[in-house]
């Protein structure tokens, strides 16, 4: 889209392009270092912030994603890494499903079938299987999401919109 304006000396019309909107913001060095810790191949990834959420993109597609994101309305692009809260990353549930997740970056809690169903229903889960802090919740070796243990309590970080409602 462009704006038409009259040229005073030529008597005709000239087109002035609209300024592009910038959707992607650079993440600072400390945040980028924390984000790199969460992926297996950080040299192949670049990171950007959209609003308060950080996203990861493969370097090979980064320019195309940026160009499309500035030209078209984008619903979702890249891997949602999460949001920074008091200097630490609060991981997005999509990061648990990312095939390039570095599983050594965070403690993993393996749950049996009954506990996994409780987790997916956002019900209380026993704190015994979890380490202090953020944990990757797994069942049969597959990542389900994240949970945070604080003392003898576990905060379920599974999205409320995805929870299992019926038994």
Predicted regions and their residues:
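Polybasic, low-complexity RNA-engagement segments
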Residues: 2-167
